[in-house]
Amino acid sequence: MAKKVEKLVKLQIPAGKATPAPPVGPALGQAGINIMGFTKEFNARTADQAGMIIPVVISVYEDKSFTFVTKTPPAAVLLKKAAGVEKGSGEPNKTKVATVTRAQVQEIAETKMPDLNAANIESAMRMIEGTARSMGFTVVD
């Protein structure tokens, strides 16, 4: 018989850098998860994506065992990396902080495709372009 999921915990953790310190430790402790077991497994699974923030969904079962699924990095993080900036604009409609090319947007859309609810790459690109505009980035051809 399948185990019953008791709780879902969603976190965004830097790849390969999960530690028992806040915010990871308290979130997992409340759910009753073995914190060291999770951090070791997460760090091993994400070691190749160093420097990225990885969203993770942890399913906690009634017997306190757990499984987790890592997602693709947030579009905003990928856009900042592609544009080479630290953060987006505080007022995106007035101040533009960077430009990204349509090719970079397509590359990000292809990376994000498994996690987006887009039917094709064009609609995924439009989603990423919208994120870029809301961050104060200009999209050029």
UniProtKB/Swiss-Prot annotation:
The encoding gene: rplK
GO cellular component terms listed in the entry, alphabetical order: cytosolic large ribosomal subunit
Listed name of the protein: Large ribosomal subunit protein uL11
Pfam families with a match to the protein in the record: Ribosomal_L11, Ribosomal_L11_N
Keyword terms: Methylation, Ribonucleoprotein, Ribosomal protein, RNA-binding, rRNA-binding
Organism ancestry: Bacteria, Bacillati, Bacillota, Bacilli, Lactobacillales
Gene3D superfamilies membership: Ribosomal protein L11, C-terminal domain, Ribosomal protein L11/L12, N-terminal domain
Summary of the function given for this chain in its UniProt record: Forms part of the ribosomal stalk which helps the ribosome interact with GTP-bound translation factors.
Entry comment on modification after translation: One or more lysine residues are methylated.
Family of the protein in this entry: Belongs to the universal ribosomal protein uL11 family.
GO BP terms, alphabetized: translation
Domain of life: Bacteria
InterPro entries per UniProt: Ribosomal_uL11, Ribosomal_uL11_bac-typ, Ribosomal_uL11_C, Ribosomal_uL11_C_sf, Ribosomal_uL11_CS, Ribosomal_uL11_N, Ribosomal_uL11_N_sf
Subunit structure: Part of the ribosomal stalk of the 50S ribosomal subunit. Interacts with L10 and the large rRNA to form the base of the stalk. L10 forms an elongated spine to which L12 dimers bind in a sequential fashion forming a multimeric L10(L12)X complex.
CDD domains tied to this protein: Ribosomal_L11
Single annotated GO MF: large ribosomal subunit rRNA binding
SMART domains with a match to the protein in the record: RL11 (SM00649)
Originating organism: Streptococcus sanguinis (strain SK36)
